[in-house]
Amino acid sequence: MLTLGEALRDATATLERAGVASPLVDARLIAAHLLGCGPLDIALRMRDEVPAGFAAAVERRARREPLQHILGTAPMGPLDLHVGPGVFIPRPETEVLADWAVRQVAGDVEKRKIVDLCTGSGALAAYIGHALIDATLYAVELDPGAATWAQRNFDEFAPQVKLIHGDVTDPTLLAEVHGTIDLVVSNPPYVPESDDLDPEVYQDPHMAVFSGADGMDVINKMVHLIFNLLKSGGAVGIEHDDTTSDAVRQVFSQHGGFGTIEVLHDLTGRARFVTARKL
């Protein structure tokens, strides 16, 4: 009988040959998912039988199907968000922006009116809404397929979030709350067009990832909506490509309606977020 330990060894070798960046971790996460246990528990189950479906799941990963599609979830802080084909998979670095957002309003119950632009799976809004259950949140998404995933996550983790179908490049969007919002967050499409990225990237919806030759198309246009939404003194935080920090800061500076324009770094020290306040 093939043991789980032996199957993990073989799976790790298979995934390594396929170019997967973290073959052992992925193999263990697949096994833990199928066994219904935590990843750390795998070390105690090396002599167990191989769970049904393990070989097929490893083969899917070897074809560079995103691990999160195989597991059906993606971690976002304390949440395991539902994801699958048709929605952008949240990345760990976005938790930095989510944590920043919660800190901006956590101490003042009067300043908890928040908008998440380009919500995708609902990652930012769900994280914030789960942490601040009395917050008023609006989440905007253009893609109906992604919005379906977002609503599923809001229903489970942050039912107070109101999902809005709309285009964040339209400065008139959400006109009924213009000038009243305390905080805007966004993880918009920001990757420069390229055909040389990891295969998994291209399984996210193109419109959720890429934003023109320099990755700035959406950010350049959405700044006007952000300004319209925020009240004076309201804050904004945007995730961006690690090559465009200067360009994003320039967008807010040249607009003329923002001050306190600052950079946030991800956990590896890369400049990945710009924050600002409406004057």
UniProtKB/Swiss-Prot annotation:
Q: Which gene encodes it?
A: prmC
Which species is the source of this protein? Answer: Corynebacterium glutamicum (strain ATCC 13032 / DSM 20300 / JCM 1318 / BCRC 11384 / CCUG 27702 / LMG 3730 / NBRC 12168 / NCIMB 10025 / NRRL B-2784 / 534)
PANTHER family in alphabetical order? HEMK METHYLTRANSFERASE, MTRF1L RELEASE FACTOR GLUTAMINE METHYLTRANSFERASE
Identify its protein family: Belongs to the protein N5-glutamine methyltransferase family. PrmC subfamily.
The alphabetized list of GO BP terms reads: methylation
Disulfide bridge partners, by residue number = none
Q: Where is substrate bound in this sequence?
A: N187, P188, P189, Y190
Residues given in the record as S-adenosyl-L-methionine binding sites: E141, N187
> What are the entry keywords?
Methyltransferase, S-adenosyl-L-methionine, Transferase
Q: What is the lineage of its organism?
A: Bacteria, Bacillati, Actinomycetota, Actinomycetes, Mycobacteriales
A family per Pfam: MTS
Q: Does the keyword Cell membrane apply?
A: no
Instruction: Write one Gene Ontology MF term.
Output: nucleic acid binding
Which EC numbers characterise this protein's activity in its record?
A: 2.1.1.297
Q: Could you tell me which SUPFAM superfamilies the record lists for this protein?
A: S-adenosyl-L-methionine-dependent methyltransferases
What Gene3D superfamilies has UniProt attached to this entry? DNA helicase RuvA subunit, C-terminal domain, Vaccinia Virus protein VP39
- What is this enzyme's catalytic activity, as reactions? L-glutaminyl-[peptide chain release factor] + S-adenosyl-L-methionine = N(5)-methyl-L-glutaminyl-[peptide chain release factor] + S-adenosyl-L-homocysteine + H(+)
What is the name listed in the Swiss-Prot or TrEMBL entry for this protein? Answer: Release factor glutamine methyltransferase
Primary enzyme class: transferase
Q: What does this protein do?
A: Methylates the class 1 translation termination release factors RF1/PrfA and RF2/PrfB on the glutamine residue of the universally conserved GGQ motif.
